[in-house]
């Protein structure tokens, strides 16, 4: 393997396939209804004209539309952020956001609202702020930019870190939150609707800054790690540790380790118990319904749905949809997960067996080409297709960018793909993360993950030389338990304490950890 691209999954944040993005039609202003041309419409256009007219004209006030969530994220400012000269109230221009002046106050309120539902990360900030465990840490962050991650970013700063931040997804940034962070003095380079060039430029501005050299990476998808290793290998060797929170990013790290190219220790947060059992499961259980409802106003009762993948994300999606009265099918490659799905009451099928009849397709695998053009050719008209995995490669969107198909944007993050005979499918967020592109995610679940990320950064940064080698590690069990304990007061939950006799009988320390590393919760 001669180059990094051979050893990693292709760009999960932006995706190599997005190089053809300009082939699609230009987005229409959501507040304007464009009169139809005086030509004969296809049957699909006739069937959906009423839906499109309502969504185009009313999306700004519709309580379930994505516009109602993004707020000022869709501000209609056509001037590219990189061409603007902006300064915050302190005179700093070390940032690049959509519009700091018009949005930062609203973004600050969003962050304050999120803090109320994030007790764990706030408790950690209060307990550790005086000790400054991240003093002298210089962290490059590449994650989703929303109110919840803003709470994490400001917590890291409060714990002593210097940070620079970019987005890991071109559609998930809340512009008003990015503006609020910029106003508070945090160097942030992110806005909703970045191009591919913008995406990599933003990460580069974070990594390669004047008089500032990163020594830690907090990644979601592996893009900051990928760029730094490929473009700044000497700088990469000076990094003390990497913290990665996504399936795709962890996969890339293991590939680098296997190829002998991972020269720094990395912490796999994605497979920590507090991430998989709470964020992946409970967060996805709520956000999949919110995403579909906001973007399509779909009625769930009686709908046939296929969920591709029955890991923790797939489990959450399937259980939520089943609870709303959907008939849910599961596709799986793993016999253990397939058996779990079967015993949970779901029918496990191959995608081709049900693709002609289902109303909704949800991917949650972290793999590529799970739903390809052949499948979409067989879908019935009006089928909704969306992705809950990290990567934008699960749905073969490039296979839909052909001359015989027509793309029509009907809402922010909602496209109709129309076949010559009039059939159409509804593609959400162009195959990217639907819950972060079309809705929001529960702040409480993100608090658990954020506290886990913060502790992982503290552990790697303060670890004595030799404790961690150039490999990928799981978060120590003791830290998982500590993160959980930070959130128990919210429920007025009281833990039972072991007696000395009980602790001796079980061979445990009374303060934990209480389960071995191989225990499956």
Curated annotation (Swiss-Prot):
Region (Disordered): 1-92
Consequences of knocking out this gene: RNAi-mediated knockdown results in extended lifespan with increased fecundity and suppression of age-related decreased climbing activity and intestinal integrity. Does not affect oxidative stress resistance. Decreases levels of S-adenosyl-homocysteine and homocysteine. Suppresses histone H3K4 trimethylation. RNAi-mediated knockdown in neurons results in extended life span. RNAi-mediated knockdown in the fat body does not show any phenotype. Simultaneous knockdown of AhcyL2 in intestine results in extended life span.
Record text on cofactor binding: Binds 1 NAD(+) per subunit.
Keywords: NAD, One-carbon metabolism
Cofactor(s) this protein cannot do without: NAD(+)
Composition bias type Low complexity, residue spans: 54-73
GO cellular-component term (any): cytosol
Coiled-coil intervals: none
Domain of life assignment: Eukaryota
Entry similarity comment: Belongs to the adenosylhomocysteinase family.
Assembly and binders: Interacts with Ahcy; the interaction may negatively regulate Ahcy catalytic activity.
Task of the protein: Might play a role in the regulation of methionine metabolism possibly by binding and inactivating Ahcy.
Protein's name in the database: Adenosylhomocysteinase-like 1
Species of the source: Drosophila melanogaster
